[in-house]
Amino acid sequence: MSGSLHDVKNEVWMKTVVIAIGLLFTGLLAYGVLAGGVGSVKHSEWEDAHHELENSEMAWNVANESGTVAEQNAAEKVWEDAHHVDVDAHLSYLTWSTAGKTIMVMFIVYAAFYGVAGFFNSIQSEEEHHEGDDHEEHHGSASPILMAGGILLFMMGFPGFVVTCKAWLGLDYEPNMTGFMLSSVGTIILIMGIGNWWREDLKGYPEQIATSHPFKGQDIRKAGMWIFLISEMMVFATFFSSYLRMRTGWCTQWAVDAGKCEVVDTTTASDLLRHDVMTLLPGAINTFALIISSYTIVLALKAAKNVNWKKSENALMARLFPSRKKAVRNYLLITIALGSLFIVLKLVEWSHLIAEGFTIDSQAGSIFFVTTGAHGLHVFIGLLVMLFMVFKADTVGYDEKNGQGIEYFGLYWHFVDLAWVAIFPAFYLY
């Protein structure tokens, strides 16, 4: 994401520290209110409901041993009601607890990444922040190599990293410190690569144009983005083809209802989600959130490239978008908020499915969680990139000369949105 040449004062980086601390405080506050506050109340309600369930089960057992048929039926009805209350109380607790924990972790990561931008730019001298026309040519960057190397090391050590984290959480696993350290080193190198990329990008270099076939005359990074998106299409096509191939061999409730088989042998996520508005609601909200976020990223690009931008005559809009620079920043912030909502609701939904016994251990569960998890990871990576874009919009700013950065990211974000529009009906409704 290229930028034009600007004079960025060193005191600007102090603002990033304050914002990072604010993000960290917001995440901890959300955890305290949602998970620690409301979550604790919901947990107490769940414990009470579970106690009532145990009592009703004992009464049902007694009725089965010595009671009449009428008493047995009455006891069974009481147990069923208590069971429904217990399940609802458990899911309510998971909703608040998972939301609080997710927001806390997300905002800690946000604070770290936003702080990285300030750190890597604050170590530059004032002269480096302001480069003249003689230094406009960009001679290449080590950032892609650093980021690729960091990702490689992280993935090499990832199995050991997961096992070690499980061991530290008290589960019955032996820590694998070799894998954990390998992933940790990879993470550090990845962050260094990202920080160096941000430092280089903020200075701004002219957009490089391809000089040979087949992309002659085209912006190099735009062509690169399209090639990257083609590879991403192949990744998600693999998920879809696996799901559709296996789905044809499953006897699901949908297949039974259609008369294609007689006995259900596989429960899919859609079997648990599509029959009730409340269970389907998180996925539906996420669909609209991503569609709206595609619109807001376009508005950010439009504001950046509109040389005749004028403040709205509407009082509310004028207050939200008082200047062209702040309009770009605020549209990006709205996009981040919508994407963050997607991640929170996704993990809340996951917690409900796991609580109901739909886990990654089953074939249907593995396809569902891997596909939606991979998509969620793409959303989260996009949110981290947008953090830098917000940082840049708030400092040097975007305009008609450097707005292609938003345009290229917008291509990625639209792809992520379109992927979800395909995932939602296939995995939630079918």
Predicted ranges, named:
Residues 2-68, 76-430:
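...captures the hydrophobic TM-helix bundle architecture rather than a specific catalytic motif
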